[in-house]
Amino acid sequence: MLASGNDAAVAIAEHISGSVDAFVELMNEEAIAMGATCTHFDNPHGMPSETHYTSAYDLYVIFKNAIENEKFVEIIHTSTYTATITNVNGVARERSWDNSNRFITGRTDTPDGFTIIGGKTGTTGEAGYCLVMLSENSLGQPIVSIVLKADGRSNLYLLTREILQEFNN
């Protein structure tokens, strides 16, 4: 979740449902149960395909459900995670993953009056630069912001800042 892990998404899918196809079916059922009716998953990792799509509203619905889970919020709020990995020969090494959300890592300034809780970035050629994010304004009100199809990373954060500032007046 900090940085996209397509291999991990496939491993989780196979572990939970026995196969990617069975997991994707479960994802689609869950999306409909949440009310995300303009979404169809074709894989567990979000890579493009003709039958893999969603809408900004459905992303909001899915994200709103996800942030009810405290562990999810903890993960999306994490700047860097370091794990010790041991290979089959017993040799251990550390591996770190950085959050791809530049507001969380401090590589982009947080808008005045906001606390960034966390979010998830995504980037593909077709979708452009995307960010779904939870923050709080100066009144402590939670704000979910969604930017899709930004034409560059810096523009993604500029658009997100502009959206957030509309909620701090």
Which ranges hold each PLM region?
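Penicillin-recognizing serine hydrolase domain
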Residues: 18-169
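Generic alpha-helical segment signature
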Residues: 1-2, 20
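Substrate-binding clefts and substrate-entry loops adjacent to catalytic sites
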Residues: 2-15, 42
